[in-house]
Amino acid sequence: MKISLVVPVFNEEEAIPVFYKTVREFQELKPYEVEIVFINDGSKDATESIINALAVSDPLVVPLSFTRNFGKEPALFAGLDHASGDAVIPIDVDLQDPIEVIPHLIEKWQAGADMVLAKRSDRSTDGRLKRKTAEWFYKLHNKISTPKIEENVGDFRLMSREVVENIKLLPERNLFMKGILSWVGGQTDVVEYVRAERVAGISKFNGWKLWNLALEGITSFSTFPLRVWTYIGLFVASISFLYGAWMIIDTLVFGNPVRGYPSLLVSILFLGGVQLIGIGVLGEYIGRIYIESKHRPKYIIKNEKQK
């Protein structure tokens, strides 16, 4: 039985040797043929040479190198495209997702699950701000989007070959893999685990990238941000109508003069701000349509392992 580990890497020269050694020395994986697909996402350090050297000595290492930094989501998709295992497991190279969890994922899969999620039962290794913003994101996404995604589940999971083949059929270029992996469906099971500290290096995923990923997730699987502006427009129009009616009554019945310049200026600025925000939301969706319409490849591989 063949198990493929899909491992995106970006400037991870310190972590790759530790990860590789840990996988190869882990006794519970010895009964399986474990393929390791490294996807080098345009690294500037020695990452490419390290994974190429591993491939020379180990035929089960598949090194893929992008021509530039395309991002983690395209890297994951590339890994799924090139993984040949009966089951495929995306996993981070920093070993925060422990190798010891993999046998439990395989056990659930062999029991009949198409996808086995690895759920973090403890996020104490993450900062308070990251934990809180992740909690808000999951709640917002699951409130307005379909399908819902399991809270505290990252890319670490096991997928059957059937699930992987279904994912590979999807044509979109704007990728939010957590949503895509939930969208394909199938019988799903969960294994809980405690996330560890990084074994080496530092995280390359900063707050700005997380923010953009959150926007990608919401706009890829929900039209609610567009719909909400219809409601905001109705609300503003209703308030404006009521205020206009009040000014007429106040002038005709009570004889009070109409307040001029200040109220007019505030109204114009308020409506201008609302319109700009609405245009910005609309622009996010139009931009994604524009990118999809070009039909560019999700990634470009510089070199592949020579058979």
Swiss-Prot record:
Localization, per the record, is: Host membrane
Q: What is its EC number?
A: 2.4.1.-
Cysteine disulfide links: none
Checking Gene3D superfamilies in the record gives: Spore Coat Polysaccharide Biosynthesis Protein SpsA, Chain A
GO molecular function terms here? glycosyltransferase activity
Q: How does it sit in the membrane?
A: Multi-pass membrane protein
Keywords of this entry: Glycosyltransferase, Host membrane, Membrane, Transferase, Transmembrane, Transmembrane helix
Segments passing through the bilayer: 229-249, 263-283
Top-rank taxon: Viruses
Question: Which enzyme class?
Answer: transferase
Q: Name one GO cellular component term.
A: plasma membrane
Q: What does this protein do?
A: Involved in O antigen modification. Catalyzes the transfer of the glucose residue from UDP-glucose to a lipid carrier.
What's the family?
Belongs to the glycosyltransferase 2 family. GtrB subfamily.
Spell out the protein name for this chain: Bactoprenol glucosyl transferase
What gene does the UniProt entry assign to this protein?
gtrB
